[in-house]
Structures are given as C-alpha cells and as structure tokens.
Amino acid sequence: MLEFKHYTIAVHNLESAVENYKNLFGMESVTETEHNDIGNFDSISMGYDGNTVLRLIESSADDTAVARLMKSRANEFNPNGEGVYLLAFEADDTEGIAQRIESNGGRITRLPGRKNFFVHPTSSNFGFMEIMPKPG
C-alpha cells in the first residue's frame, strides 16, 4: 500500500519560492538547500514543525528533465511553466510494488543499489511518482 509523503513543485527561482511559501502559508524551511547531481537541480523541503509538506526544486541547467517540463508547459498565464512536478509516496514493500507495476506493463526507473524508484509518467496518467521505502 502506498502512503502519501509529499509533493514537489518545480519553480524558476528557488529563493523567491521559499519566501512565498513562508509568507503565504507560514511554512518553514525543513532542510537546507540541497543539490541533486543526478537530476541537476537544487531543492529545499518546506513544512511545519520539522515535517515536510512539499519540496521546491529549481533546475540548475537548461537541458534537465525539470527544465524541459517547465518549458513545455509555459504559457501566457504561467510564463515560467512552474507547477507540480512529482508526487512522493512511501511503502513497506517497494520491491513488490515495483514488480506489480512492471508486470502490468508499467515503466519504472531506479538507480542500482537503491530501494526507491520512479514511475514513468506515461504509466501513471502523467503523474510523475517516486516510491520510497518507509523509514525504520
């Protein structure tokens, strides 16, 4: 069974987005800014009382998956293409869930040695998902 963990929003300016969530929603930074070398983006977790509600990510280059998605959905109402990027879930049996997805024709991506994996958007009605093991 999947348990919702947090969602990730792609933004064009991480610093201004952090301030926006602090001012509008009273959230606090739960983590320091972190750089992800694989996806080439910077991120920060936001939430309340040390608990993550959402992650904000900003692409570090123009040719990343995050940047390409933002460019593809930019329009006159959303000139920077910002918006929900990923839904993160936790599960007791990530291996079983991965096998179920693949045995039913779904596509997943994972790095060697990692228990978390990503569900390709074409397999989940274009909702990019990360499934990670529950801590403990």
Walk through the language-model features, giving the residues of each.
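Residue-level marker for the onset of beta-strands and adjacent loop->beta junctions
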Residues: 5, 42-43, 85, 115
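Conserved active-site tyrosine of GNAT-family acetyltransferases
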Residues: 17-22, 101
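Vicinal oxygen chelate
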Residues: 45-47, 54-55, 88, 95-136
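Short, solvent-exposed interaction modules
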Residues: 72-92, 97-99
